[in-house]
Swiss-Prot record:
Pfam families: UDPG_MGDP_dh (PF00984), UDPG_MGDP_dh_C (PF03720), UDPG_MGDP_dh_N (PF03721). NAD(+) binds at residues 13-14, 33, 85, 126, 338. This is UDP-N-acetyl-D-mannosamine dehydrogenase. The active site is at residues 212, 266. Coiled coil: none annotated. Gene3D superfamilies: Cytochrome c1, transmembrane anchor, C-terminal (1.20.5.100), NAD(P)-binding Rossmann-like Domain (3.40.50.720). Belongs to the UDP-glucose/GDP-mannose dehydrogenase family. WecC subfamily. Homodimer. UDP-N-acetyl-alpha-D-mannosaminouronate binds at residues 160-161, 212, 216, 219, 250, 252, 263, 330-331, 416.
Length: 420
């Protein structure tokens, strides 16, 4: 059965580019999102997120009649679920959005349909999704019941893209395809090959789920090593960026760069999925999470020390000292603030500091709710002119372009080594 109509559930940072990629190959794509503003924006041929080149692809797809956004699922030949999978307060995975998405498409499923879960999920999530669908549609058979003869094929296929490079990597990167049966894997592979130039690597759903978690946990552990080095070097009076540059001249050493912590919807979240299911075994992964989650507190301590030095060297009162935080996104040159340590640092500083806290984030037009009423959003030039203490949190290209002579401040906390 060919895939004439493809539905993508969730039109966020992964879902919308995926929908656009299929639509660019002249497939009819129905994008579904509960956010009415996002749906309206997309149907105008515009986008509600920041991602290079995505706006052009969406505009062409909408104007050509290949991409339509709606708030409720419609019949299709393939459904891709790309909704958030956050964790709860106890770091347990929260699958409520996946469950809701599965139950929303259940009424429109028909024999021969393919359902793919893309959302990063704990091991066993695909099987759980299949169970939810089976309970909602007892008139259809599913892989856990009928194997290769199932009416509905189900697979898990995680994304592997870098924000800011999504429209390139979505097409070029290899894809892990984890079907509940070999037929499920084959059909999922055929679907992605509509736009994929990379290789479809087939496995089972549980291995595919663990593969995604492993990739991001590996990166988290390596970042934790760099962040721990930054703490040690600060204590020992060593420039951590020089140290890493020298150590990386060893042909088998590749230390990552430290920062204010780890953010985003993947690296800061996914390791907890492994830890929650394997608390006694995932000791290294757990420790890395604690190191990275603790780094923002260390940054705030450095800021407090800088303010104390500023007060000791000037005749200003604490209420007169202005602190400027540069960057809120979880990585450079994007607008995504999810799980961003920079947001947490800015909030902690603003809650502690009696003076004004300025924030510079060139990729957003308004502050997140967690910072409203606490900080003031400023442009780069104004912040440099007004602030007494500078805090570099995200190495956006705009910040890297700041000339040394434009920085007059003596008190600087640079978590990214931009002004080293």
């Amino acid at each position: 059965m060919s895939f004439e109509t493809i539905s993508v559930i969730g039109l966020g940072y992964i879902g919308l580019p995926t929908a656009a990629a299929f639509a660019s190959r002249k497939k009819k794509v129905i994008g579904v999102d509960v956010n009415a503003h996002a749906v309206e924006t997309i149907n105008r041929g515009a986008i509600h997120i920041v991602e290079p080149d995505l706006d052009k692809v969406v505009k062409i797809a909408v104007e050509g009649g290949y991409l339509q956004a709606v708030t409720k699922p419609q019949a299709a030949d393939a459904f891709l679920i790309a909704v958030p999978t956050p964790f709860k307060g106890d770091h347990e995975p929260d699958m409520i959005f996946v469950e809701s998405a599965a139950k929303s498409i259940a009424p429109v499923l028909k024999k021969g349909d393919l359902v793919i879960l893309e959302s990063t999920s704990p091991v066993g999530a695909t099987e759980q999704m299949a169970q939810w669908l089976a309970e909602a549609r007892p008139d259809l058979s599913f892989p856990q019941q009928a194997g290769e003869a199932a009416d509905i094929n189900i697979a898990y296929c995680p994304e592997r893209v870098l924000p800011g490079q999504v429209m390139v990597e979505l097409i070029q990167n290899d894809r892990v395809i984890g079907g509940m049966t070999p037929k499920c894997s084959a059909r999922a592979s055929a679907l992605y090959k509509i736009f994929l130039e990379g290789e479809c690597v087939v496995t089972n759903s549980r291995t595919a789920e663990m593969c995604k978690l492993t990739e991001n946990s590996f990166r988290d552990v390596n970042i934790a090593f760099a962040n721990e080095l930054s703490l040690i070097c600060d204590e020992q009076g060593i420039n951590v960026w020089e140290l890493i540059r020298l150590a990386n001249r060893h042909p088998r050493v590749n230390i990552l760069q430290p920062g204010p912590g780890v953010g985003g919807h993947c690296i800061a979240v996914d390791p907890w999925f492994i830890v929650s299911q394997n608390p006694q075994l995932a000791r290294l992964i757990h420790t890395a999470r604690l190191v990275n989650d603790g780094k923002p507190l260390w940054v705030v301590d450095r800021v407090k020390a800088a303010v104390a030095d500023c007060l000791a060297a000037s005749d200003k009162r604490a209420s007169e000292v202005k602190i400027a935080c540069f960057g809120l996104a979880f990585k450079p040159d994007i607008d995504d603030l999810r799980e961003s340590p920079a947001v947490g640092v800015a909030r902690l500083i603003a809650e502690w500091h009696v003076g004004e806290t300025l924030v510079v984030e060139p990729n957003v037009e308004q502050l997140p709710k967690s910072l409203m009423g606490l900080v003031t959003l400023k442009d780069t030039a104004t912040a440099l002119q007004q602030a007494d203490v500078l805090v570099m949190l995200v190495d956006h290209k705009q910040f890297k372009a700041i000339k040394p002579e434009d920085i007059k401040q003596q008190w600087i906390v640079d978590t990214k080594g931009v002004w080293r």
